[in-house]
Swiss-Prot record:
<comment type="function">
    <text>Necessary for the succinyl substitution of periplasmic glucans. Could catalyze the transfer of succinyl residues from the cytoplasmic side of the membrane to the nascent glucan backbones on the periplasmic side of the membrane.</text>
</comment>
<keyword id="KW-0812">Transmembrane</keyword>
<keyword id="KW-1003">Cell membrane</keyword>
<feature type="transmembrane region" description="Helical">
    <location>
        <begin position="17"/>
        <end position="37"/>
    </location>
</feature>
<feature type="transmembrane region" description="Helical">
    <location>
        <begin position="91"/>
        <end position="111"/>
    </location>
</feature>
<feature type="transmembrane region" description="Helical">
    <location>
        <begin position="173"/>
        <end position="193"/>
    </location>
</feature>
<feature type="transmembrane region" description="Helical">
    <location>
        <begin position="311"/>
        <end position="331"/>
    </location>
</feature>
<keyword id="KW-0472">Membrane</keyword>
<feature type="transmembrane region" description="Helical">
    <location>
        <begin position="274"/>
        <end position="294"/>
    </location>
</feature>
<keyword id="KW-0012">Acyltransferase</keyword>
<keyword id="KW-1133">Transmembrane helix</keyword>
<feature type="transmembrane region" description="Helical">
    <location>
        <begin position="239"/>
        <end position="259"/>
    </location>
</feature>
<dbReference type="Pfam" id="PF01757">
    <property type="entry name" value="Acyl_transf_3"/>
</dbReference>
<keyword id="KW-0808">Transferase</keyword>
<dbReference type="GO" id="GO:0005886">
    <property type="term" value="C:plasma membrane"/>
</dbReference>
<feature type="transmembrane region" description="Helical">
    <location>
        <begin position="137"/>
        <end position="157"/>
    </location>
</feature>
<comment type="pathway">
    <text>Glycan metabolism; osmoregulated periplasmic glucan (OPG) biosynthesis.</text>
</comment>
Amino acid sequence: MNPVPAQREYFLDSIRAWLMLLGIPFHISLIYSSHTWHVNSAEPSLWLTLFNDFIHSFRMQVFFVISGYFSYMLFLRYPLKKWWKVRVKRVGIPMLTAIPLLTLPQFIMLQYVKGKAESWPGLSLYDKYNTLAWELISHLWFLLVLVVMTTLCVWIFKRIRNNLENSDKTNKKFSMVKLSVIFLCLGIGYAVIRRTIFIVYPPILSNGMFNFIVMQTLFYLPFFILGALAFIFPHLKALFTTPSRGCTLAAALAFVAYLLNQRYGSGDAWMYETESVITMVLGLWMVNVVFSFGHRLLNFQSARVTYFVNASLFIYLVHHPLTLFFGAYITPHITSNWLGFLCGLIFVVGIAIILYEIHLRIPLLKFLFSGKPVVKRENDKAPAR
């Protein structure tokens, strides 16, 4: 068992929680954006569309960097098999719990909201399976991807550790320019793979499980490994936590390119491939922007921050059906998009916190939505000697 730092990375905990909670305004703004979703407002809002695109352009890339960082930290703490078991439990159990309790009722609700309940019996067996794959995994996709990544990293992390034992890690030097070139190449490589699949067998790209297990994992795995490397090499971590005007400017320009691709790109042409290249490098640069900002403002411990760090996963899991309920049944009665957006935030966050407090008082639910066993504190006094 290898030693790990005793000091908790408070700013990384906070950033991870905020990125999770950003899913709430992201999905609520999606209702009022120009993007087609399960439910949409009568008229889209340009500013809420821009806000939605901004969150979507970088949020999950930074999230997976932090996940990789903490995953490697636990990798050094536990034996290999126990590490895999602990990690898979912590993400797999909440995912499997949320399917029958959250996404299945959500799917049934949407069938009636969108008027598709009557046509369901007429679908082919494959169409039913694929629809269920998309709808039941839904916003839980990142948990499935984390399970896949954890399994792959049983081998990858072992290789990294073995290579470190045979080399001097203090001599490893990183620069943002070098990383940018690497991630640009990774983005191009991903685009080539996707385009090849599109040419050879396009229907597979519409398969839900293939999209989650293969394509999403393939895109986000470099960020996950980057997080592990940031834990290993202090110089790399310092590169991300030190503010960089170059990264900020590059991220801003990349976001403009992202918006232009969204506006003028075509799904039948190269829009998705171009997006993968842009978001690969944009995600890297935003790691610096977010980490440096968080390190400066969020690197402290407080009861309020700890509360939302602990609550973030549960709140994220329950917010999605609440958001769709709001969009389907309440949004049509609010004429102002901005008022609807603010009401949606209050509605979803308020109910999510109430549900979180309720679930804390039910040990079984607390275990199922966290994947962590409920620890009973021993109050017995130590025997006298």
